[in-house]
Amino acid sequence: MSIQINSAHDIRVEYRGHFYAEDELRESIWLVNMELRNGLPRRERIEAKRQIAEMEAALKALVTAEGAGR
């Protein structure tokens, strides 16, 4: 996982080949949670839970990097 810092206010983390800001990651986690609540087939449910765990780890790394940069 890599962190990209464009300025003091634009810190992004890489997740699956794309760079995300904190609000984008939070929105993505929320959307996947909504899909889980609406019901998914077993395989898709397992993948969604894995994605949430990965995105939460990326979000934690991003928040840590933002805290260290202040």
Stretches found by the model and what they are:
Residues 1-7, 61-70:
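Short intrinsically disordered terminal tails
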Residues 2-37:
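N-terminal acidic leader/helix
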Residues 34-46:
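Charged, low-complexity interaction regions
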